[in-house]
């Protein structure tokens, strides 16, 4: 079965310079939710219109694209993809702004369509407040009556048309061009194709979220909240502990291992993988990173980093792109790393910047250490070998190498390589001037300062 996704609408109520269908929901463009589901059934095509170039950049390359330059209704959109309609197979119609339609529901729809041998199978839903929706009217044949055309009796019907259909390709091809635009809007409505057949069946879903469209940012937020709840509940059923699901935001693309604990106000985004027995949060953001087992990340930000097993990060740490922490590393408060590999059992506990650095195993980085990696034109590397001890308040001016088991004195500015097993000092010698304060104040240690 092929799928044609209609996604050419203007999306005016979003009040955005971006097409509606590329707005992200839990890390994934809205239309890609639909495409990923549709791909389970076969080949996928999309009908685009408004700012189609932007949409084309986010959808997979194997999706066929058709353009609807003028938005003249749903039937007109299908006509734009006329060549995509199969002659001997079925066609599923979906919408780029209805992101959460499920595979299971569509599979039921397909099963009913095949078993009933219908020309059209309609997905319906029951709404307590169906105002604004087309009603399913059951008589000698099934009809769809739009809300604006419904009398009081029909308006009491709670079964509505979701706009999702499966057509026999042959029937659709033979009749789509018969649809007229003799209505106030001068548009071609796909529902009008029902005039050409009595061979219609329906399937009803009781999950309203999966057939709810996004028209504005309020609906976008509501749908995202509902889906976030489902994602968090799925993770909890799989063995993840989420202390407060309502305050935790996890993208659909994230993977988390068993017995990991997620504390409140944590954001886990993109292609992130987290192992087992970790503690994440509170107040932590992790994006596009790979984290091993038994890792603690507390009140910190991690992006495009690799963290191996048994590592501790935070509080108030920032791991930037290219950071690789090997097992048993400790990164403490107010430490920032970027494009740095930090070896096993190494510690950087306080107030440190490590950029473009390669650091060995069992190294101690003293508080206040800075790798001075940028000379105003280009970045330079710092190398610190196994067992080195970097004193507090050090500036390591790259390019520079600290050898194996070498030590640098506290307060040093290191501008030259320090050989292994050596001590590097780069600071002014302390001078003590006795009784300087007394002489400065004319011999009166408690003299008041002049106003």
UniProtKB/Swiss-Prot annotation:
Binding site for acetyl-CoA: 367, 373-374, 392, 410, 427
GO terms of molecular function: glucosamine-1-phosphate N-acetyltransferase activity; magnesium ion binding; UDP-N-acetylglucosamine diphosphorylase activity
InterPro entries linked: Bifunctional_GlmU, GlmU-like, GlmU_C_LbH, Hexapep, MobA-like_NTP_Trfase, Nucleotide-diphossugar_trans, Trimer_LpxA-like_sf
Keyword Kinase set for record: no
Subcellular location: Cytoplasm
Protein name from the UniProt record: Bifunctional protein GlmU
BP GO terms, sorted: cell morphogenesis; cell wall organization; lipid A biosynthetic process; peptidoglycan biosynthetic process; regulation of cell shape; UDP-N-acetylglucosamine biosynthetic process
EC number: 2.7.7.23, 2.3.1.157
Self-association and partners: Homotrimer.
Cofactor: Mg(2+)
Location of region: N-acetyltransferase: 239-451
Annotated region described as Pyrophosphorylase, given as residue ranges: 1-217
HAMAP family registered for this protein in UniProt: GlmU
GO CC annotations, alphabetized: cytoplasm; membrane
């Amino acid at each position: 079965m092929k799928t044609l996704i209609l996604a050419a609408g203007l999306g005016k109520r979003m009040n955005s310079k971006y097409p509606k269908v590329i707005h992200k929901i839990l890390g994934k463009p809205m239309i890609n939710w639909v495409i990923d589901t549709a791909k389970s059934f076969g080949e996928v095509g999309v009908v685009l219109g408004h700012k189609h170039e932007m949409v084309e950049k986010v959808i997979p390359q194997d999706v066929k694209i058709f353009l609807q330059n003028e938005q003249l209704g749903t039937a007109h959109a299908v006509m734009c993809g006329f060549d995509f309609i199969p002659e001997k197979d079925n066609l599923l119609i979906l919408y780029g702004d209805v992101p959460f339609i499920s595979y299971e529901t569509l599979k039921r729809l397909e099963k009913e369509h095949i078993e009933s041998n219908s020309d059209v199978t309609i997905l319906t839903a029951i709404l307590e407040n169906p105002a604004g929706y087309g009603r399913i009217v059951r008589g000698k044949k099934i009809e769809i009556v739009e809300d604006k055309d419904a009398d009081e009796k029909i308006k009491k019907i709670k079964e509505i048309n979701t706009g999702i259909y499966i057509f026999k390709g042959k029937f659709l091809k033979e009749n789509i061009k018969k649809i007229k635009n003799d209505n106030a809007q001068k548009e071609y409505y796909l529902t009008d194709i029902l005039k050409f057949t009595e061979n219609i069946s329906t399937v009803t879903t009781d999950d309203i979220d999966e057939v709810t469209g996004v028209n504005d940012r309020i609906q976008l937020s509501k749908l995202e909240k509902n889906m976030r709840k489902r994602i968090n509940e799925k993770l909890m059923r799989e063995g993840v502990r989420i202390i407060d699901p309502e305050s935790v935001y996890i993208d659909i693309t994230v993977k988390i291992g068993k017995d990991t604990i997620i504390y409140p106000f944590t954001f886990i985004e993109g292609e992130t993988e987290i192992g087992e027995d970790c503690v994440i949060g509170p107040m932590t953001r992790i994006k596009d990173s790979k984290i091993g087992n038994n890792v603690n990340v507390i009140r910190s930000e991690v992006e495009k980093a690799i963290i191996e097993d048994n590592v501790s990060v935070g509080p108030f740490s920032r791991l930037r792109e290219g950071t690789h922490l090997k097992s048993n590393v400790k990164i403490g408060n107010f430490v920032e790393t970027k494009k740095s590999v930090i070896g096993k059992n190494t510690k950087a506990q306080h107030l440190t910047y490590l950029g473009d650095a390669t650091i060995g195993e069992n190294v101690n980085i003293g508080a206040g250490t800075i790798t001075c990696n940028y000379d105003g034109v280009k970045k330079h590397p710092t190398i610190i070998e196994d067992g080195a001890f970097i004193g507090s308040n050090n500036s390591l001016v790259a390019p520079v190498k600290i050898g194996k088991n070498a030590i640098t004195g506290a307060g040093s500015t290191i501008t030259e390589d320090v050989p292994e097993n050596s001590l590097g000092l780069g600071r002014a010698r302390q001078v003590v001037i006795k009784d300087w304060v007394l002489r400065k104040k004319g011999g009166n240690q408690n003299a008041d300062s002049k106003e």
